[in-house]
Amino acid sequence: MIIAVHSYKGGTGKTLISLNLAALFAKMGKRVCLIDLDLRAPSLCTTFGKRNRFWVNDYLSKACTIENVLTDCSSNIALKGKLCVGLANPSIEAIREMTAKDRKWEMEALGRLVSLRRVLMEDLHFDYVFFDTSPGLQYSSINAVITADLALVVTTTDEAESEGTRLMIRDLYDLFAKKTAIIINKIDSECLSAMSRRDGLIKIGSRQWPIVGALPCFCDILEDEGRCIYTVEKPNHPFSLMLQEMAKKLEKLQPATSHGLCQIS
């Protein structure tokens, strides 16, 4: 299954959740691939600290194959399964170049992503692929959502962000009949208690969308600045335990097949 982890605004914890879910599934024995598609603000390189000859940017620009981009990090993290990571180029020059890309390039990049899902799922036999996308309605994030089987939307309780998220799901995800699940992050304790009494659904427009996770704000995680993979290094941390429950819910959303361009309502 390909999961695009998306948000309406930056700063929701999208990358942290992408990273820890990917590592958790690999820890469970799955073959997992994590791709940094936040080309305008890449951050996974902070965790993995690798200098690559080829980046995701190069793959999307047809300068290399995806095999040239992926790095197997399984042995470094001691996982039961496999975790391969594709990093975006964090240099200022590369970020400026991505920001200047026109619509024609973005359309060609969509074709590369469609080809990528076939290679990752059919040729390289990954069980799960996580796209850590750019926030908002950038072409690159829309491309990732279109290509994925599931859009996993990370939001907070901020009123403006919640409203923007609702509009994004209603106007974009519904357009592509995209299967969607929601994570609400950085919730204060009072709201979290109220959330636990709900039925696990949120209404947007005329449809009900599943909430697969409700996470409080953890100050110690903020202080780590992405250096720790909690689900592997601190499996008993409350954040890790909550993601374990979240992973069970995501497994149940697995489509019947992930080898076509699935768009499931």
Outline where the language-model segments fall.
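Walker A/P-loop NTP-binding active-site region of P-loop NTPases
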Residues: 2-69, 127-128
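P-loop/Walker-type NTP enzyme "switch/lid" segment
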Residues: 39-121, 223-226
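Conserved nucleotide-binding/hydrolysis micro-motifs of P-loop NTPases
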Residues: 39-40, 90-93, 136, 158-160, ...
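NTP-binding/hydrolysis catalytic cores, primarily Walker-type P-loop NTPases
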Residues: 105-110, 226-265
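Inter-motif core of Ras-like GTPase G domains
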Residues: 124, 138-159
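Well-ordered beta-strand positions
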Residues: 128, 150-153, 181, 211-213
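Conserved C-terminal guanine-recognition region of P-loop GTPase G domains, centered on the G4
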Residues: 165-177
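Beta-strand-loop-alpha "switch" segments that mediate conformational coupling across diverse proteins
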Residues: 186-189, 198-232, 243
